[in-house]
Amino acid sequence: MIEFLHEHGGQLMSKTLEHFYISIVALLLAIIVAVPIGILLSKTKRTANIILTVAGVLQTIPTLAVLAIMIPIFGVGKTPAIVALFIYVLLPILNNTVLGVQNIDSNIKEAGKSMGMTQFQLMKDVELPLALPLILGGIRLSSVYVISW
């Protein structure tokens, strides 16, 4: 074991760093896409149910099958891996964002409206901070997914 590490230690470290790079890029892209879409979807329950169902179906596809589909489109390399991981980590963030914003007490929203807040101010100053624990829970779950796949 020590001999193997001595011979291939540099390559092991570079591949580990490459894995972290791919994982972080996929996770950041998923956060950038899923949180705003989740906020928009939280306003319409019917559309949210349709989109979350489609995202859930996409997540049931095995990773190797997604990679097999991505390689002819994007070629071999980091790009198909990032796209495949992005698809897999999108759902927990999207789902938790929608649930976090939808489950805010209507009395709290009403209090913000009665103070004269615009829809944007209400989202920025009231809804988003209250939904943040659930959103961060989705990001945490997705970070575990992205590292393990």
Task: Say what each PLM segment does.
Residues 15-22, 71-92:
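Loop-to-helix entry region at the N-terminal start of transmembrane alpha-helices
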Residues 24, 28-36, 40, 86:
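Generic alpha-helical transmembrane segments of integral inner-membrane proteins
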Residues 37-69, 85, 95-99, 110:
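Cytoplasmic-entry segments and transmembrane alpha-helices of multi-pass inner-membrane transporters
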Residues 87, 120-149:
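Transmembrane alpha-helices
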